[in-house]
Regions:
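Alpha/propeptide regions of enzymes that mature by internal proteolysis
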Residues: 1-149
């Protein structure tokens, strides 16, 4: 049996998956969001000396939550973890999330990378990553840019 790439040769060749990117040229950083038409199963393997993650513990098979609403990958080191908050806020407005009574709690695990010394301006008054997360979610589609633009 040989495997052949899908029509796009992208992760979005999997039916129902979409990816969105957002970047800020001033801070030289960005966010990528992956979501599906419905909550999906995800897993994680965390490595490195100083990993930065959000809600990744709930991806273990013994946890209550069995699916996630989106995954977020962000620059910005610890500041970038806030990108998942922007995604969660937008998903909640869309009615997505884990049902807790009448409330919907979007499950949005995320991970960051350290890019604070990349030459971009980090002298912001307000953390830009929450908005970048929301922008990336809004841009999610089957065809998306790969890498830095």
């Amino acid at each position: 049996m040989s495997l052949a790439p899908g029509p796009r040769n992208l992760i979005t060749d999997v039916p129902g998956l979409r990816v969105g990117n957002a970047q800020d040229l001033v801070i030289k950083s960005g966010v990528t969001v992956m979501l599906a038409d419905a909550p999906f199963t995800a897993g994680v393997h965390i490595m490195g000396g100083a990993p930065g993650t959000r809600e990744t513990d709930l991806l273990a098979p013994d946890k209550t939550v069995e699916a996630v609403d989106a995954l977020v990958l962000s620059g910005g080191s610890a500041f970038g973890l806030d990108a998942a908050s922007g995604v969660a806020d937008a998903l909640r407005v869309m009615g997505r999330g884990f049902a807790v009574g009448d409330i919907r709690v979007p499950i949005v695990p995320g991970a960051i990378l350290f890019d604070l010394l990349n030459g971009g301006s980090k002298d912001w008054a307000e953390n830009p990553y929450k908005n970048l997360g929301k922008q990336a979610l809004e841009k999610a589609q089957q065809d998306f840019s790969i890498g830095s633009e």
